């Protein structure tokens, strides 16, 4: 009898050890994105801005920022491009953000699918629009796997001041610049929605009414979205409203710092 009891206790201890080991190792395995057997990261929100407001050095500068951040976390083997549109200029056609990122699917740091296709990402059909993509606060992660601090996380009146925000990583910074309409395409060229195609850090002069967040002729501005889907306008992930200007100091006044979406180019671009 004692022998049987002893064997039962030994078996029990082994089972407990296995369960404890599984509980510890399983979450670690989920976090090891890009490891053999895992789902490679193909989408992220930049953890930090370039730092010159809407002047990103054009699309090339934004793409390089995506590539550099991805490389630091071991995801540099993919080709990364920024989800940004540019507006038409004389002799230069517009570029649509949706045409820069391939066909999908895209997964975040944790291997969670954000969208299965361009149509799913943008809600191109009524059915897909009703379904929505899977980009929200818990999935719109940075390349480091962090949630972007949002509207109600750490309330502090100073989070509209760049001097405070730049040294406070948990401050509200849930606006992501896109320069795009909700379908992922560029705006017409008559009003600035892209900080002059990502080359300007200018702010509107005193002649402009800054009480609203809509663009106007001659007014420096950039269109933003919300990865957490919380904020002004329509709460869209990629096209909600404009900003107070294009300088680094102006972006935090509406709770942004110049972060943007990066996608690994999947499939063949359109």
Say what each PLM segment does.
Residues 10, 19, 41-42:
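Short non-domain terminal segments
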Residues 32-270:
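Secreted/extracellular ectodomain signature
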Residues 2-6, 151-154:
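Intrinsically disordered, low-complexity regulatory regions of eukaryotic regulatory proteins
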Residues 15-26:
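Bacterial N-terminal signal peptides
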Residues 2, 28-33:
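Short, low-complexity disordered leader/linker segments with a strong preference
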Residues 4-16:
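Bacterial N-terminal signal peptides that target proteins for export
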């Amino acid at each position: 009898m004692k022998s049987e009891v002893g064997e039962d206790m030994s078996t029990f201890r082994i089972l407990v050890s296995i369960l404890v080991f599984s509980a510890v190792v399983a979450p670690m395995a989920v976090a090891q994105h890009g490891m053999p057997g895992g789902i490679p990261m193909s989408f992220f929100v930049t953890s930090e801005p370039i730092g010159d407001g809407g002047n990103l050095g054009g699309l090339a500068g934004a793409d390089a920022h995506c590539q550099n951040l991805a490389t630091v976390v071991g995801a540099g083997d993919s080709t990364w491009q920024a989800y940004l549109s540019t507006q038409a200029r004389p002799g230069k056609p517009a570029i649509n953000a949706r045409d820069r990122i391939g066909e999908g699917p895209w997964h975040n740091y944790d291997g969670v699918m954000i969208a299965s296709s361009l149509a799913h990402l943008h809600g191109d059909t009524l059915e897909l629009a009703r379904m929505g993509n899977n980009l929200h606060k818990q999935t719109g992660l940075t390349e480091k796997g962090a949630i972007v601090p949002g509207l109600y996380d750490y309330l502090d009146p100073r989070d509209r001041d760049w001097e405070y925000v730049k040294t406070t990583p948990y401050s509200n910074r849930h606006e992501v610049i896109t320069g795009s309409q909700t379908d992922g395409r560029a705006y017409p060229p008559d009003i600035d929605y892209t900080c002059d195609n990502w080359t300007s850090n200018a702010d509107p002069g005193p002649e402009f009414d800054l009480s609203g967040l809509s663009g106007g002729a001659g007014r420096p501005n950039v269109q933003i979205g919300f990865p957490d889907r919380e904020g002004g306008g329509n709460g869209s992930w990629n096209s909600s409203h404009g900003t107070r200007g294009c300088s680094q100091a102006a972006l935090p006044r509406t709770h942004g710092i110049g972060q943007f979406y990066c996608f690994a180019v999947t499939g063949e671009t359109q």
